């Protein structure tokens, strides 16, 4: 079964540990990735159920996640913690994401070729139950005509929204609702916060 939130075994283990902590704060885990390197980087994306998350929220999540990871200690080596919002052209990792963003453009990639292709671009058209499980519906252009295809959710290896004016307007609305001052909005600062807590964790394990 597809798990776009956490792809590897260690990612899934980390998700089991931190998801309850994030949910207790009123947020949801969108994606988690442990990236290798001289010092590993633990990347966490989180959001509010209704959308819209700010820098202070990311800092609160980082503090709580750092605390539980210090207790559970699932990582043997040093790591750096990054907590971020999903961004405007966000990844779609949960079935409900394809319903929430129905009507917006997205790029989808499958594990195996379907009719000779693995990459699809079109407008999200919701979710429906299929014979083989939940299907993500996508309106695509073929030969100058629009047709709706269904891709089994378990076939997906990657999915992401496409940056459009309509999407930007919706994301800015969510950020405004989350308390971000739009006129002073710094997208780079908003979308990602690298916390000192993560750096402290790395130093402690060296």
Swiss-Prot record:
Keywords: Cytoplasm, Ribosome biogenesis. It is found in: Cytoplasm. Its main location: cytoplasm. GO terms for biological process: ribosomal small subunit assembly; translation. SUPFAM superfamilies: YhbC-like, C-terminal domain, YhbC-like, N-terminal domain. InterPro entries: Ribosome_maturation_RimP, RimP_C, RimP_C_sf, RimP_N, RimP_N_sf. One of its GO terms (cellular component) is cytosol. Pfam families: DUF150_C (PF17384), RimP_N (PF02576). Belongs to the RimP family. HAMAP family: RimP (MF_01077). Required for maturation of 30S ribosomal subunits. This is Ribosome maturation factor RimP. The gene is rimP.
């Amino acid at each position: 079964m597809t798990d776009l939130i956490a792809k590897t075994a260690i990612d899934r283990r980390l998700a089991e540990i931190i998801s309850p902590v994030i949910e207790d704060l009123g947020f949801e885990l969108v994606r988690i990735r442990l990236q290798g390197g001289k010092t590993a980087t633990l990347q966490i994306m989180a959001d509010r159920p209704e959308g819209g998350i700010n820098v202070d929220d990311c800092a609160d999540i980082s503090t709580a996640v750092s605390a539980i990871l210090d207790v559970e200690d699932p990582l043997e080596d040093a790591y750096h913690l990054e907590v971020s919002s999903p961004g405007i052209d966000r990844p779609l990792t949960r079935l409900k994401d394809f319903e929430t963003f129905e009507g917006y453009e997205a790029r989808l990639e499958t594990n195996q070729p379907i009719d000779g292709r693995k990459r699809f671009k079109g407008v999200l058209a919701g979710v429906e139950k299929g014979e083989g499980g939940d299907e993500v519906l996508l309106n695509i252009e073929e030969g100058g005509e629009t047709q709706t295809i269904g891709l089994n959710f378990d076939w997906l290896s990657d999915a992401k929204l496409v940056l459009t004016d309509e999407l930007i307007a919706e994301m800015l609305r969510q950020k405004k609702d989350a308390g971000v001052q739009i006129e002073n909005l710094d997208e780079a600062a908003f979308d990602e916060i690298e916390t000192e807590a993560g750096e402290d964790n790395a130093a402690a394990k060296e």
